[in-house]
């Protein structure tokens, strides 16, 4: 009888772990490929803008060249996440932090790729957490800074959860953002410009920690059951 009660309790805890996740989050993850180089026409127009949903990915591909291309003809960048003012002025020095560094233009394994997951919560103390309905901004500076004022910048809008369709199944869909529908740079009236600051443990909201705690309780109860 005790075993039946324990198994029932374990089932209830497991059910809560599964269904206490954000109901608006997507199951299918879209991946958006961005080729970060000055020859990309979207950067040349200055209106590079993509819309994503929570749990989507941004894949940034760095410039890459054949070995025959001399070093002084290659492009190298440091990419920063900045606030709206930094994006508008293309200035990372006031409110911004380094995200990635494209510093291997002759990488033997192909172009460097960096990925950003637009997640509500991160297990890393210096990770970045994203919120639906807000905008986020990326810019780059050239390495070395030789006086060129060309500014490569990207605006990302995280769509509200009610506009992200929930689907069944787990798979990745990959998009080159050039194939996506053109998006207006005009934000919605309720759009919030997010500050470019990584989240820290004490500042993170506590709601998503509940599934982790429940999972810990589940494992503890399972261990107790096995000792009976």
From Swiss-Prot:
Disordered: annotated segments: 186-205
GO cellular component: adherens junction; basement membrane; caveola; cell periphery; external side of plasma membrane; GABA-ergic synapse; plasma membrane
Cleavable signal peptide: 1-20
Localization (cell): Cell membrane; Membrane, Caveola
One Gene Ontology biological process: ephrin receptor signaling pathway
Lipidation, GPI-anchor amidated asparagine type: 203
Positions glycosylated per UniProt: 37
Sequence ranges assigned to domain Ephrin RBD in this UniProt record: 29-162
Basic and acidic residues compositional bias, start-end: 190-200
Keywords, comma-separated and alphabetical: Cell membrane, Developmental protein, Differentiation, Disulfide bond, Glycoprotein, GPI-anchor, Lipoprotein, Membrane, Neurogenesis, Signal
InterPro entries to which the protein is assigned, alphabetical: Cupredoxin (IPR008972), Ephrin (IPR031328), Ephrin-A_Ecto (IPR034252), Ephrin_CS (IPR019765), Ephrin_RBD (IPR001799)
UniProt-listed CDD domains: Ephrin-A_Ectodomain
Cleaved propeptide residues: 204-228
Pfam families (UniProt xref): Ephrin (PF00812)
A GO molecular-function annotation: chemorepellent activity
UniProt xrefs under SUPFAM superfamilies: Cupredoxins
Lipid bilayer topology: Lipid-anchor; GPI-anchor
Cystine pairings recorded for this chain: 62-102, 90-151
Keyword Metal-binding: no
Tissues/organs with expression: Expressed in brain, heart, placenta and lung.
UniProt subunit comment: Binds to the receptor tyrosine kinases EPHA2, EPHA3, EPHB1 and EPHB2. Interacts with EPHA8; activates EPHA8. Forms a ternary EFNA5-EPHA3-ADAM10 complex mediating EFNA5 extracellular domain shedding by ADAM10 which regulates the EFNA5-EPHA3 complex internalization and function.
Family to which this protein belongs: Belongs to the ephrin family.
Function: Cell surface GPI-bound ligand for Eph receptors, a family of receptor tyrosine kinases which are crucial for migration, repulsion and adhesion during neuronal, vascular and epithelial development. Binds promiscuously Eph receptors residing on adjacent cells, leading to contact-dependent bidirectional signaling into neighboring cells. The signaling pathway downstream of the receptor is referred to as forward signaling while the signaling pathway downstream of the ephrin ligand is referred to as reverse signaling.
Protein name per Swiss-Prot or TrEMBL: Ephrin-A5
Gene: Efna5
């Amino acid at each position: 009888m005790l075993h039946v009660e324990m198994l029932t309790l374990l089932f209830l805890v497991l059910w809560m772990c599964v269904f206490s996740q954000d109901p608006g989050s997507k199951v299918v993850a879209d991946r958006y490929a961005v080729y970060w180089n000055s020859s990309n026409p979207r950067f040349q127009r200055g209106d590079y803008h993509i819309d994503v949903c929570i749990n989507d990915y941004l894949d940034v591909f760095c410039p890459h060249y054949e070995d025959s291309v001399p070093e002084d003809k290659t492009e190298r960048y440091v990419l920063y996440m900045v606030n709206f003012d930094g994006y508008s002025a293309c200035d990372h020095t006031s409110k911004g932090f380094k995200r990635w560094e494209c510093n291997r233009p002759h990488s033997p394994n192909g172009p460097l790729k960096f990925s950003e997951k637009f997640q509500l919560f991160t297990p890393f103390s210096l990770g970045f957490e994203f919120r639906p309905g807000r905008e986020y901004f990326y810019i780059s500076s050239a390495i070395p800074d030789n006086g060129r004022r060309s500014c490569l910048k990207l605006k990302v809008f995280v769509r509200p959860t009610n506009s992200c369709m929930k689907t069944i199944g787990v798979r990745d869909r990959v998009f080159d953002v050039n194939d996506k529908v053109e998006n207006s740079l005009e934000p919605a009236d309720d759009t919030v410009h997010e500050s470019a600051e990584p989240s820290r443990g004490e500042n993170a909201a506590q709601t998503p920690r509940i599934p982790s705690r429940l999972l810990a309780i589940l494992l503890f109860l399972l261990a107790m059951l096995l000792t009976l």
